Amino acid sequence: VAPAATLLPIKVFSGGTAASSAVTAGLDYAIASNARVINLSLGATSPTGDTGLRRVAATNNAVVVIAAGNDSTASPNWPSRYAKEAWANGTLISVGAVDVNKRLHTYSNKAGDIAPFYLVAPGVSIISSYGSSYAHMTGTSMAAPAVAGAAALVTGYWPYLRANQVSAILLTTADDLGAPGVDAIYGRGMLNVNRALAPIGSYTYRTITGAITRISLSTPGVVSYQPSVSSPSAFANVNTEVFDDYGRNYSSAEGAALAVRTALTVDGVLGRMDRLLDTSEQVLADGSTLLRLNSRAPDSKTQRATSPSQSLVSYQSAAGLSFSAGDGGLSSMTLGLMGSSWGHRLAGLDPILGNPLSNFAPEHRFASLGLPLVAGWQARAATLQSTRHRAASGDITLMEMGHVGARHAINVSTGDLSETGLLGGYSNSALGLNQATHSQGVTISGAYLVAPNWALAASYSQTRTAAPRASGMLTHATDIEANAYGVGVVRSDWLKTGDRLSLTVHTPLSARSGHLTYSVVQSVDETGSPQFGTQEVTLRPHAREWRTEARYTMPVRQWGGNLSAALSTRLHADNDEQAALQWVMGVRYQLTF
Protein backbone atom coordinates (compact mmCIF):
# COMPACT_ATOMS: atom_id res chain seq x y z
CA VAL A 1 0.00 0.00 0.00
CA ALA A 2 2.84 2.38 0.88
CA PRO A 3 5.89 0.94 -0.94
CA ALA A 4 8.17 3.82 -0.02
CA ALA A 5 7.52 3.57 3.71
CA THR A 6 10.32 2.59 6.07
CA LEU A 7 9.43 -0.42 8.23
CA LEU A 8 10.51 -0.82 11.84
CA PRO A 9 9.75 -4.35 13.13
CA ILE A 10 9.39 -4.44 16.92
CA LYS A 11 9.15 -7.79 18.70
CA VAL A 12 6.80 -7.93 21.68
CA PHE A 13 5.89 -11.64 21.61
CA SER A 14 7.71 -14.35 23.50
CA GLY A 15 6.51 -17.68 22.24
CA GLY A 16 2.83 -17.29 21.48
CA THR A 17 2.02 -14.51 23.95
CA ALA A 18 2.90 -10.89 24.62
CA ALA A 19 2.96 -9.45 28.11
CA SER A 20 1.38 -6.02 28.68
CA SER A 21 4.78 -4.71 29.74
CA ALA A 22 6.29 -5.93 26.47
CA VAL A 23 3.60 -4.16 24.46
CA THR A 24 4.22 -0.96 26.44
CA ALA A 25 7.97 -1.25 25.91
CA GLY A 26 7.40 -1.77 22.19
CA LEU A 27 5.19 1.31 21.99
CA ASP A 28 7.77 3.39 23.87
CA TYR A 29 10.44 2.24 21.42
CA ALA A 30 8.22 3.24 18.50
CA ILE A 31 7.72 6.71 20.01
CA ALA A 32 11.44 7.11 20.57
CA SER A 33 12.06 6.10 16.94
CA ASN A 34 9.58 8.77 15.73
CA ALA A 35 7.29 6.19 14.16
CA ARG A 36 4.32 7.88 12.42
CA VAL A 37 2.17 4.76 12.08
CA ILE A 38 2.04 1.84 14.52
CA ASN A 39 0.35 -1.45 13.61
CA LEU A 40 -0.76 -3.75 16.44
CA SER A 41 -1.85 -7.09 15.02
CA LEU A 42 -2.55 -8.49 18.47
CA GLY A 43 -5.32 -8.63 21.01
CA ALA A 44 -6.40 -9.74 24.46
CA THR A 45 -9.64 -10.48 26.27
CA SER A 46 -8.77 -8.10 29.12
CA PRO A 47 -7.40 -4.54 29.27
CA THR A 48 -3.77 -4.38 28.21
CA GLY A 49 -1.26 -1.91 26.81
CA ASP A 50 -3.06 1.27 27.83
CA THR A 51 0.02 2.79 29.50
CA GLY A 52 1.99 2.87 26.29
CA LEU A 53 -1.02 3.81 24.18
CA ARG A 54 -1.74 6.81 26.39
CA ARG A 55 1.79 8.07 25.82
CA VAL A 56 1.47 7.57 22.05
CA ALA A 57 -1.88 9.36 21.95
CA ALA A 58 -0.52 12.27 23.97
CA THR A 59 2.09 13.01 21.29
CA ASN A 60 -0.56 13.01 18.50
CA ASN A 61 2.30 12.05 16.21
CA ALA A 62 1.51 8.40 15.40
CA VAL A 63 -1.64 6.70 14.16
CA VAL A 64 -2.16 3.40 15.97
CA VAL A 65 -3.98 0.74 13.93
CA ILE A 66 -5.17 -2.23 16.00
CA ALA A 67 -6.72 -5.55 14.96
CA ALA A 68 -10.28 -5.89 16.30
CA GLY A 69 -9.82 -9.58 17.14
CA ASN A 70 -11.10 -12.91 15.83
CA ASP A 71 -13.56 -14.02 18.49
CA SER A 72 -16.86 -13.46 16.59
CA THR A 73 -17.92 -11.05 19.33
CA ALA A 74 -20.19 -8.01 19.03
CA SER A 75 -17.35 -5.60 19.88
CA PRO A 76 -13.56 -5.53 19.43
CA ASN A 77 -11.28 -6.88 22.12
CA TRP A 78 -8.40 -5.12 23.85
CA PRO A 79 -6.39 -2.98 23.19
CA SER A 80 -8.57 -2.11 20.18
CA ARG A 81 -11.39 -1.11 22.55
CA TYR A 82 -9.37 1.86 23.77
CA ALA A 83 -10.14 3.68 20.50
CA LYS A 84 -13.33 5.14 21.99
CA GLU A 85 -11.62 6.60 25.06
CA ALA A 86 -11.26 10.37 25.33
CA TRP A 87 -7.55 10.08 26.03
CA ALA A 88 -7.09 8.28 22.69
CA ASN A 89 -7.79 11.66 21.04
CA GLY A 90 -8.93 9.99 17.81
CA THR A 91 -5.49 8.51 17.11
CA LEU A 92 -6.54 4.83 17.40
CA ILE A 93 -8.33 2.85 14.68
CA SER A 94 -9.90 -0.58 15.22
CA VAL A 95 -9.91 -2.85 12.15
CA GLY A 96 -12.18 -5.76 11.23
CA ALA A 97 -11.72 -8.23 8.36
CA VAL A 98 -13.89 -8.69 5.24
CA ASP A 99 -13.69 -11.15 2.37
CA VAL A 100 -13.48 -10.46 -1.35
CA ASN A 101 -17.23 -9.79 -1.41
CA LYS A 102 -16.90 -7.16 1.33
CA ARG A 103 -18.68 -9.37 3.86
CA LEU A 104 -17.44 -9.40 7.44
CA HIS A 105 -15.54 -12.62 8.06
CA THR A 106 -17.20 -15.08 10.42
CA TYR A 107 -14.47 -14.82 13.04
CA SER A 108 -13.98 -11.06 12.88
CA ASN A 109 -15.17 -9.07 15.86
CA LYS A 110 -17.83 -6.50 14.94
CA ALA A 111 -17.71 -2.74 15.50
CA GLY A 112 -20.08 -2.62 18.46
CA ASP A 113 -19.58 0.41 20.67
CA ILE A 114 -16.31 1.26 18.88
CA ALA A 115 -18.18 1.89 15.60
CA PRO A 116 -17.06 5.54 15.07
CA PHE A 117 -13.42 4.39 15.19
CA TYR A 118 -13.83 1.07 13.36
CA LEU A 119 -12.92 0.23 9.75
CA VAL A 120 -12.90 -2.99 7.79
CA ALA A 121 -10.28 -4.05 5.26
CA PRO A 122 -9.44 -7.19 3.25
CA GLY A 123 -8.40 -9.89 5.72
CA VAL A 124 -9.29 -13.24 4.14
CA SER A 125 -6.69 -15.39 2.34
CA ILE A 126 -4.05 -12.66 2.45
CA ILE A 127 -0.54 -13.72 1.39
CA SER A 128 1.78 -13.22 4.36
CA SER A 129 5.21 -14.28 5.52
CA TYR A 130 5.03 -17.51 7.48
CA GLY A 131 8.20 -18.84 9.04
CA SER A 132 10.75 -18.93 6.25
CA SER A 133 8.09 -19.02 3.53
CA TYR A 134 4.68 -17.54 2.65
CA ALA A 135 1.12 -18.63 3.31
CA HIS A 136 -2.47 -17.47 2.86
CA MET A 137 -3.58 -16.09 6.22
CA THR A 138 -6.99 -14.92 7.47
CA GLY A 139 -7.95 -12.63 10.34
CA THR A 140 -8.06 -9.08 11.56
CA SER A 141 -4.27 -9.23 11.97
CA MET A 142 -4.14 -9.42 8.15
CA ALA A 143 -6.63 -6.55 7.71
CA ALA A 144 -4.96 -4.09 10.09
CA PRO A 145 -1.74 -3.71 8.00
CA ALA A 146 -3.82 -2.56 5.00
CA VAL A 147 -5.17 0.32 7.07
CA ALA A 148 -1.71 0.99 8.51
CA GLY A 149 -0.35 1.15 4.96
CA ALA A 150 -3.05 3.66 4.00
CA ALA A 151 -2.17 5.75 7.05
CA ALA A 152 1.49 5.64 6.00
CA LEU A 153 0.56 6.73 2.49
CA VAL A 154 -1.42 9.74 3.72
CA THR A 155 1.31 10.65 6.19
CA GLY A 156 3.97 10.31 3.51
CA TYR A 157 2.24 12.79 1.22
CA TRP A 158 1.42 15.21 4.02
CA PRO A 159 3.92 14.66 6.86
CA TYR A 160 2.73 17.75 8.71
CA LEU A 161 -0.66 16.18 9.49
CA ARG A 162 -1.34 15.25 13.11
CA ALA A 163 -2.19 11.63 13.89
CA ASN A 164 -5.86 12.30 14.67
CA GLN A 165 -6.19 14.10 11.32
CA VAL A 166 -4.87 11.06 9.46
CA SER A 167 -7.25 8.80 11.39
CA ALA A 168 -10.19 11.09 10.66
CA ILE A 169 -9.35 11.11 6.95
CA LEU A 170 -9.33 7.31 6.76
CA LEU A 171 -12.54 7.00 8.77
CA THR A 172 -14.55 9.67 6.93
CA THR A 173 -13.58 8.46 3.45
CA ALA A 174 -14.51 4.81 4.04
CA ASP A 175 -17.15 3.22 1.79
CA ASP A 176 -20.34 2.68 3.73
CA LEU A 177 -21.25 -0.99 4.25
CA GLY A 178 -24.16 -2.61 6.05
CA ALA A 179 -26.83 -0.31 7.47
CA PRO A 180 -26.59 3.28 6.19
CA GLY A 181 -24.15 5.40 8.15
CA VAL A 182 -22.03 4.28 11.06
CA ASP A 183 -23.36 0.90 12.22
CA ALA A 184 -22.53 -1.70 14.88
CA ILE A 185 -21.23 -4.28 12.39
CA TYR A 186 -19.08 -2.45 9.85
CA GLY A 187 -18.54 0.78 11.79
CA ARG A 188 -17.42 3.41 9.31
CA GLY A 189 -17.21 0.90 6.48
CA MET A 190 -14.57 -0.29 4.02
CA LEU A 191 -11.17 1.36 3.70
CA ASN A 192 -10.96 3.41 0.45
CA VAL A 193 -7.40 4.53 -0.23
CA ASN A 194 -8.25 6.55 -3.33
CA ARG A 195 -10.85 8.62 -1.51
CA ALA A 196 -8.46 9.08 1.40
CA LEU A 197 -5.91 10.66 -0.93
CA ALA A 198 -8.45 12.89 -2.68
CA PRO A 199 -9.29 16.38 -1.37
CA ILE A 200 -12.10 16.60 1.16
CA GLY A 201 -14.71 19.30 1.66
CA SER A 202 -13.44 22.38 -0.11
CA TYR A 203 -10.46 24.03 -1.71
CA THR A 204 -8.98 26.94 0.20
CA TYR A 205 -6.92 29.48 -1.73
CA ARG A 206 -4.49 31.56 0.31
CA THR A 207 -2.64 34.74 -0.58
CA ILE A 208 0.23 36.65 0.95
CA THR A 209 -2.22 39.42 1.90
CA GLY A 210 -4.10 37.02 4.16
CA ALA A 211 -7.12 36.82 1.87
CA ILE A 212 -8.79 33.41 1.86
CA THR A 213 -11.14 32.03 -0.78
CA ARG A 214 -12.99 28.77 -0.20
CA ILE A 215 -14.72 26.82 -2.96
CA SER A 216 -16.77 23.79 -1.95
CA LEU A 217 -15.88 20.65 -3.87
CA SER A 218 -19.60 19.94 -4.12
CA THR A 219 -20.24 23.23 -5.92
CA PRO A 220 -20.95 22.71 -9.63
CA GLY A 221 -18.00 23.73 -11.73
CA VAL A 222 -18.05 26.70 -14.08
CA VAL A 223 -16.94 26.88 -17.67
CA SER A 224 -13.70 28.86 -17.59
CA TYR A 225 -12.34 31.08 -20.35
CA GLN A 226 -9.40 33.41 -20.66
CA PRO A 227 -10.31 37.01 -21.58
CA SER A 228 -10.91 36.92 -25.34
CA VAL A 229 -8.67 39.96 -25.83
CA SER A 230 -5.73 37.85 -24.61
CA SER A 231 -4.40 34.42 -25.61
CA PRO A 232 -4.70 30.88 -24.18
CA SER A 233 -1.07 31.02 -23.03
CA ALA A 234 -1.44 34.22 -21.00
CA PHE A 235 -2.44 32.41 -17.81
CA ALA A 236 -0.35 29.27 -18.40
CA ASN A 237 1.98 29.88 -15.44
CA VAL A 238 -0.71 30.60 -12.87
CA ASN A 239 -0.27 27.54 -10.66
CA THR A 240 -0.84 27.38 -6.94
CA GLU A 241 -1.13 25.02 -4.01
CA VAL A 242 -4.65 24.76 -2.61
CA PHE A 243 -5.72 23.23 0.69
CA ASP A 244 -8.58 20.90 1.59
CA ASP A 245 -10.51 20.89 4.85
CA TYR A 246 -7.68 18.99 6.57
CA GLY A 247 -5.05 21.46 5.40
CA ARG A 248 -3.56 19.08 2.83
CA ASN A 249 -1.95 20.86 -0.11
CA TYR A 250 -2.74 19.95 -3.71
CA SER A 251 -1.24 21.43 -6.85
CA SER A 252 -3.79 23.26 -8.97
CA ALA A 253 -3.04 24.44 -12.50
CA GLU A 254 -5.53 27.29 -12.38
CA GLY A 255 -4.27 28.89 -15.58
CA ALA A 256 -4.56 25.69 -17.60
CA ALA A 257 -8.32 25.70 -17.08
CA LEU A 258 -8.46 29.04 -18.89
CA ALA A 259 -6.57 27.88 -21.98
CA VAL A 260 -9.69 27.68 -24.13
CA ARG A 261 -9.37 27.57 -27.90
CA THR A 262 -12.26 28.24 -30.24
CA ALA A 263 -12.79 26.93 -33.74
CA LEU A 264 -14.56 27.93 -36.90
CA THR A 265 -17.70 25.95 -37.69
CA VAL A 266 -19.78 25.66 -40.83
CA ASP A 267 -22.88 26.67 -38.89
CA GLY A 268 -21.07 29.70 -37.51
CA VAL A 269 -20.07 30.79 -41.00
CA LEU A 270 -23.33 30.04 -42.82
CA GLY A 271 -25.68 30.71 -39.93
CA ARG A 272 -25.46 34.47 -40.29
CA MET A 273 -26.36 34.13 -43.97
CA ASP A 274 -29.40 32.08 -43.12
CA ARG A 275 -30.57 34.69 -40.63
CA LEU A 276 -30.44 37.26 -43.40
CA LEU A 277 -32.40 34.94 -45.66
CA ASP A 278 -35.00 34.35 -42.94
CA THR A 279 -35.69 38.07 -42.73
CA SER A 280 -38.93 39.43 -44.17
CA GLU A 281 -39.48 43.13 -44.87
CA GLN A 282 -42.88 44.70 -45.33
CA VAL A 283 -43.60 48.22 -46.62
CA LEU A 284 -46.72 49.59 -44.97
CA ALA A 285 -49.28 51.90 -46.56
CA ASP A 286 -47.86 55.02 -44.92
CA GLY A 287 -44.38 54.32 -46.28
CA SER A 288 -43.00 52.88 -43.04
CA THR A 289 -41.23 49.53 -43.03
CA LEU A 290 -41.55 46.53 -40.75
CA LEU A 291 -38.72 44.01 -40.55
CA ARG A 292 -39.30 40.63 -38.92
CA LEU A 293 -37.09 37.61 -38.37
CA ASN A 294 -37.63 34.24 -36.73
CA SER A 295 -34.68 31.88 -36.87
CA ARG A 296 -34.95 28.26 -35.73
CA ALA A 297 -31.99 26.15 -34.74
CA PRO A 298 -32.26 22.44 -35.64
CA ASP A 299 -32.44 19.91 -32.83
CA SER A 300 -29.06 18.15 -32.62
CA LYS A 301 -30.68 14.70 -32.40
CA THR A 302 -33.65 14.90 -34.77
CA GLN A 303 -32.35 17.65 -37.08
CA ARG A 304 -35.86 19.07 -37.02
CA ALA A 305 -36.54 22.75 -36.51
CA THR A 306 -37.25 23.77 -32.94
CA SER A 307 -39.18 26.77 -31.66
CA PRO A 308 -37.67 30.13 -32.67
CA SER A 309 -34.32 30.61 -30.92
CA GLN A 310 -33.71 34.06 -32.41
CA SER A 311 -36.25 36.75 -33.14
CA LEU A 312 -36.24 40.36 -34.21
CA VAL A 313 -38.76 43.01 -35.09
CA SER A 314 -37.80 46.43 -36.40
CA TYR A 315 -40.08 49.31 -37.32
CA GLN A 316 -39.04 52.47 -39.16
CA SER A 317 -41.50 55.23 -39.90
CA ALA A 318 -41.51 57.23 -43.09
CA ALA A 319 -40.24 60.17 -41.04
CA GLY A 320 -37.16 58.21 -39.90
CA LEU A 321 -38.19 57.28 -36.35
CA SER A 322 -37.18 53.68 -35.66
CA PHE A 323 -37.61 51.05 -32.98
CA SER A 324 -36.12 47.56 -32.80
CA ALA A 325 -36.27 44.72 -30.30
CA GLY A 326 -35.28 41.10 -30.30
CA ASP A 327 -33.87 38.05 -28.60
CA GLY A 328 -31.06 35.64 -29.39
CA GLY A 329 -28.21 38.11 -29.97
CA LEU A 330 -29.37 39.79 -33.19
CA SER A 331 -28.82 43.43 -32.23
CA SER A 332 -26.01 43.86 -34.78
CA MET A 333 -28.59 43.67 -37.58
CA THR A 334 -30.25 46.91 -36.44
CA LEU A 335 -27.36 48.92 -34.96
CA GLY A 336 -24.55 50.95 -36.46
CA LEU A 337 -24.35 51.15 -40.23
CA MET A 338 -26.29 47.89 -40.49
CA GLY A 339 -29.23 49.68 -38.90
CA SER A 340 -29.04 52.64 -41.26
CA SER A 341 -30.70 53.04 -44.64
CA TRP A 342 -27.47 51.60 -46.07
CA GLY A 343 -27.95 48.34 -44.21
CA HIS A 344 -29.19 46.45 -47.27
CA ARG A 345 -26.18 47.69 -49.28
CA LEU A 346 -23.72 46.52 -46.62
CA ALA A 347 -25.18 43.06 -45.96
CA GLY A 348 -22.25 40.67 -45.53
CA LEU A 349 -20.00 43.30 -43.93
CA ASP A 350 -21.56 43.02 -40.47
CA PRO A 351 -18.47 41.23 -38.99
CA ILE A 352 -16.50 44.49 -39.20
CA LEU A 353 -19.16 47.16 -38.64
CA GLY A 354 -20.58 46.40 -35.19
CA ASN A 355 -19.40 47.70 -31.84
CA PRO A 356 -17.16 44.86 -30.55
CA LEU A 357 -18.38 45.39 -26.99
CA SER A 358 -21.63 43.71 -28.04
CA ASN A 359 -19.66 40.48 -28.53
CA PHE A 360 -19.35 40.23 -24.75
CA ALA A 361 -23.09 39.54 -24.61
CA PRO A 362 -23.34 36.92 -27.38
CA GLU A 363 -26.68 35.73 -26.05
CA HIS A 364 -28.84 38.75 -25.35
CA ARG A 365 -32.16 40.45 -25.70
CA PHE A 366 -32.14 44.04 -26.84
CA ALA A 367 -34.16 47.14 -27.63
CA SER A 368 -33.16 50.27 -29.54
CA LEU A 369 -34.72 53.60 -30.43
CA GLY A 370 -33.60 55.79 -33.32
CA LEU A 371 -34.44 59.46 -33.79
CA PRO A 372 -33.97 61.44 -37.01
CA LEU A 373 -32.08 64.70 -36.64
CA VAL A 374 -31.21 67.19 -39.38
CA ALA A 375 -29.36 66.95 -42.67
CA GLY A 376 -29.25 63.15 -42.75
CA TRP A 377 -28.08 62.66 -39.16
CA GLN A 378 -29.69 60.16 -36.84
CA ALA A 379 -29.22 59.34 -33.15
CA ARG A 380 -29.83 55.93 -31.66
CA ALA A 381 -29.81 54.48 -28.14
CA ALA A 382 -29.78 50.77 -27.42
CA THR A 383 -29.60 48.45 -24.46
CA LEU A 384 -28.45 44.82 -24.56
CA GLN A 385 -29.14 42.45 -21.67
CA SER A 386 -27.25 39.18 -21.43
CA THR A 387 -29.23 35.97 -20.96
CA ARG A 388 -26.25 33.88 -19.81
CA HIS A 389 -25.83 32.55 -16.29
CA ARG A 390 -22.75 31.15 -14.48
CA ALA A 391 -20.61 32.34 -17.38
CA ALA A 392 -19.12 35.53 -18.75
CA SER A 393 -22.01 37.90 -19.42
CA GLY A 394 -22.47 41.59 -19.88
CA ASP A 395 -25.16 44.23 -20.11
CA ILE A 396 -24.38 46.95 -22.63
CA THR A 397 -25.64 50.45 -23.29
CA LEU A 398 -24.89 51.94 -26.71
CA MET A 399 -25.27 55.52 -27.92
CA GLU A 400 -24.84 56.12 -31.64
CA MET A 401 -24.71 59.02 -34.03
CA GLY A 402 -24.83 58.38 -37.76
CA HIS A 403 -25.03 60.23 -41.04
CA VAL A 404 -26.05 58.96 -44.45
CA GLY A 405 -25.30 60.85 -47.64
CA ALA A 406 -25.66 60.12 -51.32
CA ARG A 407 -22.37 58.23 -51.56
CA HIS A 408 -21.25 57.80 -47.97
CA ALA A 409 -22.40 56.67 -44.54
CA ILE A 410 -20.65 57.10 -41.20
CA ASN A 411 -21.47 56.01 -37.66
CA VAL A 412 -19.95 56.68 -34.26
CA SER A 413 -20.94 54.22 -31.54
CA THR A 414 -20.01 54.59 -27.87
CA GLY A 415 -20.55 51.66 -25.57
CA ASP A 416 -20.67 51.04 -21.85
CA LEU A 417 -20.22 47.41 -20.76
CA SER A 418 -21.10 46.22 -17.26
CA GLU A 419 -19.82 42.67 -17.19
CA THR A 420 -19.73 39.71 -14.87
CA GLY A 421 -16.35 38.49 -16.01
CA LEU A 422 -13.43 40.20 -17.68
CA LEU A 423 -13.68 40.90 -21.41
CA GLY A 424 -15.16 37.50 -22.10
CA GLY A 425 -13.06 35.77 -19.45
CA TYR A 426 -14.67 33.86 -16.61
CA SER A 427 -13.57 31.47 -13.89
CA ASN A 428 -14.24 30.46 -10.33
CA SER A 429 -13.78 33.10 -7.66
CA ALA A 430 -10.13 32.21 -7.05
CA LEU A 431 -8.85 33.91 -10.21
CA GLY A 432 -11.00 36.99 -9.75
CA LEU A 433 -12.55 36.69 -13.21
CA ASN A 434 -16.14 36.32 -12.05
CA GLN A 435 -16.43 39.80 -10.57
CA ALA A 436 -18.21 42.87 -11.89
CA THR A 437 -16.04 44.87 -14.30
CA HIS A 438 -16.68 47.97 -16.35
CA SER A 439 -15.53 48.80 -19.88
CA GLN A 440 -16.10 51.70 -22.23
CA GLY A 441 -15.38 51.93 -25.92
CA VAL A 442 -15.94 53.80 -29.15
CA THR A 443 -16.31 52.46 -32.68
CA ILE A 444 -16.02 54.63 -35.78
CA SER A 445 -17.24 53.04 -38.98
CA GLY A 446 -17.77 54.34 -42.47
CA ALA A 447 -18.80 53.21 -45.92
CA TYR A 448 -18.34 54.73 -49.36
CA LEU A 449 -20.20 53.96 -52.55
CA VAL A 450 -17.38 53.43 -55.04
CA ALA A 451 -19.81 52.62 -57.87
CA PRO A 452 -23.58 52.02 -58.02
CA ASN A 453 -23.13 48.37 -56.99
CA TRP A 454 -19.81 48.60 -55.12
CA ALA A 455 -19.40 49.70 -51.50
CA LEU A 456 -16.22 49.93 -49.44
CA ALA A 457 -16.38 49.95 -45.62
CA ALA A 458 -13.95 50.21 -42.70
CA SER A 459 -14.10 50.49 -38.92
CA TYR A 460 -11.87 51.13 -35.91
CA SER A 461 -12.66 50.43 -32.24
CA GLN A 462 -10.88 51.36 -29.03
CA THR A 463 -11.88 50.18 -25.55
CA ARG A 464 -10.71 50.74 -22.00
CA THR A 465 -11.52 48.49 -19.06
CA ALA A 466 -11.13 49.77 -15.52
CA ALA A 467 -8.66 47.75 -13.45
CA PRO A 468 -10.42 44.80 -11.77
CA ARG A 469 -10.41 44.99 -7.99
CA ALA A 470 -8.38 42.60 -5.86
CA SER A 471 -10.33 39.36 -5.53
CA GLY A 472 -9.33 35.81 -4.68
CA MET A 473 -5.72 35.29 -5.76
CA LEU A 474 -5.81 38.50 -7.81
CA THR A 475 -3.98 41.11 -5.76
CA HIS A 476 -3.35 43.86 -8.31
CA ALA A 477 -4.44 44.84 -11.81
CA THR A 478 -4.06 47.70 -14.26
CA ASP A 479 -6.49 49.24 -16.70
CA ILE A 480 -6.81 47.25 -19.92
CA GLU A 481 -6.79 48.88 -23.34
CA ALA A 482 -7.76 47.03 -26.52
CA ASN A 483 -8.52 47.79 -30.14
CA ALA A 484 -10.03 46.23 -33.25
CA TYR A 485 -10.24 47.23 -36.90
CA GLY A 486 -11.24 45.89 -40.29
CA VAL A 487 -12.09 46.64 -43.91
CA GLY A 488 -14.53 45.13 -46.35
CA VAL A 489 -16.03 45.44 -49.79
CA VAL A 490 -19.39 44.30 -51.11
CA ARG A 491 -20.68 43.97 -54.68
CA SER A 492 -24.34 43.45 -55.49
CA ASP A 493 -25.84 42.27 -58.78
CA TRP A 494 -22.49 40.77 -59.72
CA LEU A 495 -23.30 37.65 -61.73
CA LYS A 496 -27.07 38.04 -61.72
CA THR A 497 -29.68 40.38 -60.35
CA GLY A 498 -30.12 40.01 -56.60
CA ASP A 499 -26.83 38.26 -55.86
CA ARG A 500 -24.20 39.60 -53.48
CA LEU A 501 -20.46 39.10 -53.01
CA SER A 502 -18.70 40.38 -49.88
CA LEU A 503 -15.07 40.27 -48.72
CA THR A 504 -13.90 41.24 -45.23
CA VAL A 505 -10.59 41.33 -43.39
CA HIS A 506 -10.56 42.26 -39.73
CA THR A 507 -8.83 41.70 -36.43
CA PRO A 508 -11.08 41.21 -33.37
CA LEU A 509 -10.67 43.16 -30.17
CA SER A 510 -7.17 42.49 -28.80
CA ALA A 511 -5.46 43.83 -25.68
CA ARG A 512 -2.74 46.41 -26.22
CA SER A 513 -1.96 46.83 -22.52
CA GLY A 514 -3.00 45.40 -19.18
CA HIS A 515 -1.52 43.28 -16.40
CA LEU A 516 -2.91 41.05 -13.66
CA THR A 517 -0.86 40.06 -10.60
CA TYR A 518 -1.68 36.89 -8.67
CA SER A 519 -0.48 35.78 -5.26
CA VAL A 520 0.19 32.04 -5.40
CA VAL A 521 1.37 29.36 -2.99
CA GLN A 522 4.50 27.88 -4.54
CA SER A 523 5.08 25.21 -1.88
CA VAL A 524 4.59 24.36 1.78
CA ASP A 525 7.22 23.96 4.47
CA GLU A 526 7.61 21.05 6.88
CA THR A 527 4.76 22.40 9.02
CA GLY A 528 2.39 22.76 6.07
CA SER A 529 2.65 26.55 6.10
CA PRO A 530 2.33 28.14 2.63
CA GLN A 531 5.34 29.68 0.91
CA PHE A 532 4.10 32.51 -1.29
CA GLY A 533 5.16 33.90 -4.64
CA THR A 534 3.61 35.98 -7.42
CA GLN A 535 2.61 35.33 -11.01
CA GLU A 536 2.32 38.18 -13.49
CA VAL A 537 -0.13 37.87 -16.38
CA THR A 538 0.43 40.10 -19.39
CA LEU A 539 -2.80 40.35 -21.33
CA ARG A 540 -1.29 41.72 -24.54
CA PRO A 541 -0.76 38.67 -26.78
CA HIS A 542 2.39 38.03 -28.81
CA ALA A 543 0.26 37.75 -31.96
CA ARG A 544 -3.17 38.97 -32.88
CA GLU A 545 -5.89 37.13 -34.70
CA TRP A 546 -6.82 37.98 -38.28
CA ARG A 547 -10.04 36.84 -39.88
CA THR A 548 -10.96 36.86 -43.56
CA GLU A 549 -14.32 36.03 -45.04
CA ALA A 550 -15.65 35.72 -48.57
CA ARG A 551 -19.41 35.33 -48.94
CA TYR A 552 -21.69 34.90 -51.89
CA THR A 553 -25.47 34.59 -51.99
CA MET A 554 -27.84 34.44 -54.90
CA PRO A 555 -31.54 33.82 -55.32
CA VAL A 556 -32.76 30.81 -57.27
CA ARG A 557 -36.12 32.23 -58.18
CA GLN A 558 -37.38 29.37 -60.32
CA TRP A 559 -37.28 27.12 -57.24
CA GLY A 560 -38.06 29.77 -54.68
CA GLY A 561 -34.80 29.28 -52.80
CA ASN A 562 -31.38 30.79 -52.12
CA LEU A 563 -27.88 29.49 -52.65
CA SER A 564 -25.18 30.51 -50.16
CA ALA A 565 -21.44 29.91 -50.18
CA ALA A 566 -18.74 31.10 -47.81
CA LEU A 567 -15.04 30.74 -47.12
CA SER A 568 -13.67 31.89 -43.78
CA THR A 569 -10.15 31.76 -42.34
CA ARG A 570 -8.52 32.54 -39.00
CA LEU A 571 -4.83 33.31 -38.68
CA HIS A 572 -3.41 33.16 -35.12
CA ALA A 573 -6.80 32.05 -33.80
CA ASP A 574 -7.52 33.29 -30.27
CA ASN A 575 -4.41 35.51 -30.57
CA ASP A 576 -2.24 32.40 -30.34
CA GLU A 577 0.91 32.59 -32.44
CA GLN A 578 1.21 28.78 -32.32
CA ALA A 579 -2.31 28.12 -33.57
CA ALA A 580 -2.69 26.43 -36.93
CA LEU A 581 -4.50 28.25 -39.69
CA GLN A 582 -8.22 27.54 -39.49
CA TRP A 583 -10.50 27.61 -42.49
CA VAL A 584 -14.04 26.59 -43.24
CA MET A 585 -15.82 26.46 -46.57
CA GLY A 586 -19.50 25.74 -46.90
CA VAL A 587 -22.31 25.76 -49.40
CA ARG A 588 -25.97 25.74 -48.46
CA TYR A 589 -29.19 25.77 -50.42
CA GLN A 590 -32.27 26.95 -48.60
CA LEU A 591 -35.75 26.42 -49.95
CA THR A 592 -38.55 28.55 -48.57
CA PHE A 593 -42.08 27.22 -48.65
Where are these regions (language model features)?
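Outer-membrane beta-barrel channels and translocator barrels
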Residues: 318-320, 374-376, 404-408, 451-453, ...
